[in-house]
């Protein structure tokens, strides 16, 4: 009788490396290790040999980068999705796509179980399992970190050393790092104390702003209907643009975020993020929206941006609500076409200029020179009607 198969979302990090051995022994099952490429740099080398040497019976590497950029990142950018006005949702955006890829492989390999390496008090367990339930409700879900005997990363490291499992984490530097092309999240270790300044060795790609070049860098980004299409006059794929902006931004200290955030499970956590390209593109996109969106649309979209960010963060990407919000966002982005020029300097971004064929800025109406075409006399009647409700209230309710 053949053994059951477990499809494991495998990153090659400490948790999932230990997990292959642990799942194989506990369930007497074959482990299909599945890794999705979301543009991470450090984690993909030698993953296949590492998975097999740790006990996996099969390994699948799925290149998700193009899909990630075009169907996930650009949707979030157009929506202006920044969780609690700060986090560009790099890890959160990647989870539903990774979960979908795991389900796809599991069905192809006739697996009966899905396993992930998410902690029992984190957000990712929600994101993975809600996606699993949406796409493959008949498959059993395993969450080893909620049930195994290890109570700390140090215990996992000891287990790995005992069973000759190669891991990069050490007891001296136990950071937990998740990386994709949209950003990097760093947690654990000394970072758990919110009063501790993040050590420089916690940062993976960005130069310290103090050590960034003394000469500012400038970039010009072209958007078409809310989507970036060209950098400094050169048309390129979304993947190439994000990679280039990550390099430019990181060199200039852009995109370091230190945040206390509200997790799905009800606790606050301290998170360190690096997201150079995301920080630059969100800044540029927002400035172009200021130029091209009608006032009420611009102001109302702020609410939608938060709703969209919450959907991503809370793991409900495959919900009807997200699809409904996409329809609204796509409508708002029709005029968001133009150029934005930015200065990057020692961790800061400043605006150098912007223009659009759909600009709602009318210099003849805005100017205070003789070229002014604004009808000043019309203001008196407008103000009378605009303030009539408050005037009436005060007359009826004096002193209130």
UniProtKB/Swiss-Prot annotation:
Reaction equation(s) it catalyzes: L-citrulline + L-aspartate + ATP = 2-(N(omega)-L-arginino)succinate + AMP + diphosphate + H(+)
GO molecular function: argininosuccinate synthase activity; ATP binding
CDD domains the UniProt entry points to: ASS (cd01999)
Key word Oxidoreductase present: no
Pathway: Amino-acid biosynthesis; L-arginine biosynthesis; L-arginine from L-ornithine and carbamoyl phosphate: step 2/3
GO cellular component assignments: cytoplasm
Chain sites annotated for binding L-citrulline: 87, 123, 127, 176, 185, 261, 273
EC number of the protein: 6.3.4.5
InterPro entries tied to this protein: Arginosuc_syn_C, Arginosuc_syn_N, Arginosuc_synth, Arginosuc_synth_CS, Arginosuc_synth_type_1_subfam, AS_cat/multimer_dom_body, Rossmann-like_a/b/a_fold
Keyword Ribonucleoprotein assigned: no
Residues given in the record as L-aspartate binding sites: 119, 123-124
Keywords of the record: Amino-acid biosynthesis, Arginine biosynthesis, ATP-binding, Cytoplasm, Ligase, Nucleotide-binding
Gene3D superfamilies named among the record's database cross-references: Argininosuccinate synthetase, chain A, domain 2 (3.90.1260.10), HUPs (3.40.50.620), Single helix bin (1.20.5.470)
SUPFAM superfamilies: Adenine nucleotide alpha hydrolases-like, Argininosuccinate synthetase, C-terminal domain
Residues that, per the record, bind ATP: 9-17, 117
PANTHER family documented for this protein: ARGININOSUCCINATE SYNTHASE
Family stated for the protein in its record: Belongs to the argininosuccinate synthase family. Type 1 subfamily.
Record-linked HAMAP family: Arg_succ_synth_type1
Subunit structure comment from the entry: Homotetramer.
Protein's name according to its UniProt entry: Argininosuccinate synthase
């Amino acid at each position: 009788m053949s053994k059951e198969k477990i499809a494991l979302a495998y990153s090659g990090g400490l948790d999932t490396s230990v997990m292959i051995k642990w799942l194989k022994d506990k369930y007497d099952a074959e482990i299909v290790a599945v890794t999705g490429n979301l543009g991470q740099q450090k984690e993909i080398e030698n993953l296949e040999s590492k998975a097999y040497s740790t006990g996996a019976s099969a390994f699948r590497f799925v290149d998700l980068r193009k899909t990630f950029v075009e169907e996930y990142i650009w949707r979030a950018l157009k929506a202006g999705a920044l969780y609690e006005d700060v986090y560009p949702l790099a890890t959160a955006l990647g989870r539903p796509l990774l979960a979908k890829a795991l389900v796809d492989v599991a069905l192809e390999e006739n697996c009966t179980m899905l396993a992930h390496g998410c902690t029992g008090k984190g957000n990712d367990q929600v994101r993975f399992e809600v996606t699993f339930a949406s796409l493959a409700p008949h498959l059993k879900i395993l969450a080893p970190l909620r049930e195994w005997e290890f109570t700390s990363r140090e215990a996992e490291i000891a287990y790995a050393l005992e069973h000759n499992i190669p891991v990069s984490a050490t007891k001296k530097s136990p950071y937990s790092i998740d990386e994709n092309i949209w950003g990097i999240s760093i947690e654990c270790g000394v970072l758990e104390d919110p009063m501790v300044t993040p050590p420089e060795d916690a940062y993976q790609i960005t130069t310290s702003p103090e050590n960034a070049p003394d000469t500012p860098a400038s970039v010009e980004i072209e958007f078409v209907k809310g989507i970036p299409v060209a950098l400094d006059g050169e048309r390129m794929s979304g993947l190439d643009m994000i990679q280039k902006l990550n390099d430019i931004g990181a060199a200039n200290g852009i995109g370091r975020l230190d945040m206390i955030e509200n997790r799905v499970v009800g606790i606050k956590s301290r998170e360190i993020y690096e997201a150079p390209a995301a920080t630059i593109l969100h800044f540029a996109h927002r400035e172009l929206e200021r130029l091209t969106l009608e006032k009420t649309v611009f102001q109302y979209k702020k609410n939608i941006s938060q709703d969209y960010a919450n959907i991503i963060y809370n793991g409900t990407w495959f919900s009807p609500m997200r699809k409904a919000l996409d329809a609204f966002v796509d409508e708002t982005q029709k005029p968001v076409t133009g150029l934005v020029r930015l200065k990057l300097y020692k961790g800061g971004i400043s605006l150098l200029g912007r223009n659009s064929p759909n600009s709602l800025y009318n210099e003849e109406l805005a100017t205070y020179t003789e070229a002014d075409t604004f009808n000043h006399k019309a203001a008196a009647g407008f103000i009378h009607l605009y303030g009539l409700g408050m005037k009436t209230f005060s007359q009826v309710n004096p002193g209130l």
